[in-house]
Amino acid sequence: NEIEYIENGIVTSHKGIDVSKYQGDIDWQAVKADGVEYAFVRLGIRGYGSGKIVLDENFADNMQGANEAGVKAGVYFFTQAVTVEEAQEEAAFVIANLAAYDVPYPVVFDVEMITGQDGRANNLTMQERTDITIAFCEAVKAAGYTPMIYGNVKCFTKMLDMTKLEQYEKWYAFYDKYMYFPYE
């Protein structure tokens, strides 16, 4: 589904995609030809049971393909960190894997809960999750990248103290026809 935002008769939106191993092999030249301007590529995850950090198996191909096709790229990492130290470990993993690529778009910290399952980070307090998020974002910023936080209404209203995260960009996930967010 494509959505265009029009302001004063001018399209103000940009076409982008997010990809991971689940999209399989991608023809990035075709993606560019379809008008896609940017992509967020999944860099990896921390396992919700094991806590093991795993690189997305298509990360390198997707980053190389996006860079070669001229599609501006950012990355995202799905966290299951349960301590500030684990968030710093995740950030170091992400930063180390970005060195070979052009990454003009943000490095995104995905803080969603594992629904219907027992994710290792599901029982964090708001303060713990906020501290973990700050630790990741500050490490990414110190490395010269733009940090961003991914979440939905639940993440941004019940799981994180947004007053402590105002300085970071947000990627707001909303899967309905009309956008709703109860805060500025």
Q: Which residues does each predicted region cover?
A:
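Conserved, mostly hydrophobic/aromatic
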Residues: 17, 31, 66, 109, ...
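Acidic-and-aromatic substrate-binding clefts and catalytic sites of carbohydrate-active enzymes
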Residues: 16-27, 44-58, 80-89, 154-158
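Hydrophobic faces of well-ordered beta-strands that scaffold small-molecule active sites
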Residues: 15-19, 39-41, 71-77, 107-109, ...
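Surface-exposed substrate-engagement region within the catalytic domains
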Residues: 97-107, 111-184
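Substrate-binding cleft and catalytic face of glycoside hydrolase catalytic domains
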Residues: 65-83
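Acidic (Asp/Glu)-rich catalytic clusters
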Residues: 9, 28-35, 58-71, 94-103, ...
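Stable alpha-helical elements in mature extracytoplasmic
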Residues: 27, 55-62, 87-90, 94, ...
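Boundary/entry segment of secreted carbohydrate-active catalytic domains
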Residues: 1-42
